[in-house]
Amino acid sequence: WGDLPLALRGGGDSWIPGSYDANLNLIYWPVAQAKPWVPASRGLTVYDPALYTNSTLALDPGDGSIQWYRQHVPGEALDLDEAFEQVLINSGGRQALYTIGKHGILWKLDRVSGEFLGYTETVYQNVFDRIDPKTGIVTYRQDIADAGIGDWVSVCPSTAGGHNWHAMAYSPESRALIIPLSQSCLEIAGREVALVEGSGGSQADRKWFEMPGTDGNLGKLTAIDVDTLEEHWSVEQRAAYMTAVLTTGGRLAFVGDVDRYFRALDVDTGSVLWETRLGTSVQGFPVTYGVDGDQYISVSTGLGGGSPRRVPQLLTPDIQHPDTGNALYVFRLTP
């Protein structure tokens, strides 16, 4: 944190709950980036890591002490949080942890020690000149590292992600993570912020544009092998995905989008097996449950959603974005 006093160290916020390993008695908690978004605005540089931000923390649930931590992107500079779900899966004799943030990089760690085990990029990114394949240490593009107040930089992906709060899901049957992604890019310039108590905020100017090579498809869904980190399949579409993925033992993956579609895909191929169009944008976290021997799928629709919804409104004006319709839909799976 450089020489910043404690009162001026902003950010490090928490988006969602972490995950608990009962055998190891550890909680894995994701932490967002430092604030304001651009290092120059907070009186720092990308070489000031802002310790524990944009990190996975392994915590003792008894006293909250940090047993280990992994700072995925020290000194984060672009409002690209690494603050989302922590998925616990055993792989290759290791007790592994998988997490992915707005950079669209899936990280694989040893959840006992925090040791780096590997990574894979799921969308186009030009933020980092290099990611060390042995350590996972990232090196920012030089113009990003050098950016001062008012200096515009152009980066992919944007603040919508990559990946955002829409959680990925694990399919034990295919040993793959099914990950919802967003494809857009960003120009960003930091504003000057008074380094006094009571100031702060995000403080940056931003513009969004289509991601090169996507043919205007903002939505992407990909299946990544948890052992090899290779892609099994991916599908792209114009509409942004706005739900977490839900997988079932019947080898289905459910996901919804801003264009009101709710679909069931084959976890092995990505093929659409069933779809329906609902009254408004499908967003939230689908759940499944059983009643009297029947299995049900429930999903919410409605408004809000943050940048994953606002950015598609700008970049896909051809898609109607309904402004009403909060509802809960329930479907019964048939044999």
Tell where the protein language model's regions lie, with residue ranges:
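Active-site glycine- and acidic-residue-rich loops that bind
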Residues: 4-14, 157-162
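Long, low-complexity segments enriched in small/aliphatic residues
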Residues: 19, 136, 143, 151-154, ...
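Extracytoplasmic/lumenal domain signature
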Residues: 1-8, 42-82, 88-94, 105-155, ...
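Extracellular structured ligand-interaction cores
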Residues: 13-17, 53-54, 83, 103-104, ...
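Short coil-to-beta-strand
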Residues: 23-30
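Structural signature of eukaryotic scaffold interfaces centered on beta-propeller domains
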Residues: 12-23, 87-92, 162-173, 245-247, ...
